[in-house]
Regions:
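SDR active-site strand-loop-helix element
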Residues: 4, 28, 60-61, 98-104, ...
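Catalytic helix-loop patch of NAD(P)-dependent Rossmann-fold dehydrogenases
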Residues: 78, 82-83, 106-147, 151-154
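NAD(P)-cofactor binding segment of oxidoreductase domains
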Residues: 71-99
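NAD(P)H-binding glycine-rich loop region in Rossmannoid oxidoreductase-like domains
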Residues: 39-79
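N-terminal Rossmann NAD(P)H-binding glycine-rich loop of SDR-like oxidoreductase domains
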Residues: 1-20
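NAD(P)-dependent short-chain dehydrogenase/reductase
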Residues: 136-184, 190-198
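Adenosine-cofactor binding site in Rossmann-like domains, unifying the SAM/SAH pocket
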Residues: 26-45
């Protein structure tokens, strides 16, 4: 199995869980991985995949910064969509199973409700648009699985994850924008990884297509951050109430 984006928040957790469960796995990232590779150099990416011929590729790579996706839509499309199209082509050629990690960012302005795979989607910004395009590329391949989710956890290096950003903001008494109109069913990366590995290891009845993997609970970003502050005993009076439509203030 090859995991693309193995040094990211989810990639790190998935690599660790895979090895604990005795999976043969190769982590790929630009640096500090089993294989250092710029996956946007598509020629090198294809040659690498051809040389390894894995049974499964898990794509954890994405630009998730909402502001960056708005500022540079071409880059967002390249990473969130076009890369997936390239992976589909090589996976189809070599009959490799492709697992593409997507997002729950399509469910906006419909309140506190749970969603299934048939729930209507809303492409509210460039992040949602490019991730949805990536889904469509992946789903054009019969031997693929697209997973919509909202994972939370720690990266411990590089740009802060949402959880790390929240902790840092609370600790340093920074202003935090709390979105009341964006609900999620966030799941921690380690629980998600264990579920995904069970799906990959499932014999006979292989799951393909589109599925959601999430928490059984639903809350908006305001509720999530306020609960987080209570659990970690942080008092922060610099909360601003905002809307996801404004984009500013949220790091996913």
């Amino acid at each position: 199995m090859i995991i693309l984006g193995s040094t990211g928040m989810l990639g790190q957790a998935l690599i660790k869980a895979a090895r604990l469960n005795n999976f043969k796995v190769i982590g790929v990232a630009r640096s500090n991985a089993d294989v250092a590779l710029d996956v946007l150099d598509f020629e090198k990416l294809i040659l690498f995949i051809e040389s390894k011929k894995p049974k499964v590729i898990v794509n954890c790579i994405a630009i998730t910064d909402l502001n960056l996706c708005e500022a540079n839509p071409e880059k967002a499309y390249l990473v969130n969509a076009h890369l997936v199209a390239v992976l589909v082509d090589i996976c189809r050629e070599l009959n490799i199973r492709l697992i593409h990690i997507s997002t729950d960012h399509f469910f906006v302005n419909d309140g506190n409700k749970k969603h299934n795979e048939a729930s209507p989607t809303v492409l509210v910004n460039n992040y949602a648009k490019t991730k949805y395009a990536g889904e469509q590329f992946a789903l054009s391949y019969q031997n693929s699985l697209v997973i919509r989710t909202n994972v939370v956890g720690f990266r411990n290096s590089g740009k802060h994850t949402f959880i790390e950003w929240v902790l840092s903001s609370l600790k340093n008494q920074k202003e935090v924008t709390l979105f009341q109109d964006f609900y999620t069913s966030s799941i921690d990366v380690y629980t998600f990884s264990e579920i995904l590995l069970k799906i990959i290891d499932k014999e006979g009845d292989i799951i393909n297509g589109l599925i959601n993997i999430a928490s059984s609970e639903v809350c908006n970003k305001e509720q999530f951050i306020r609960k987080f502050a209570i659990v970690f005993n942080y008092k922060n009076n610099k909360f601003n109430i905002g809307s996801i439509m404004s984009i500013n203030g949220l790091n996913r």
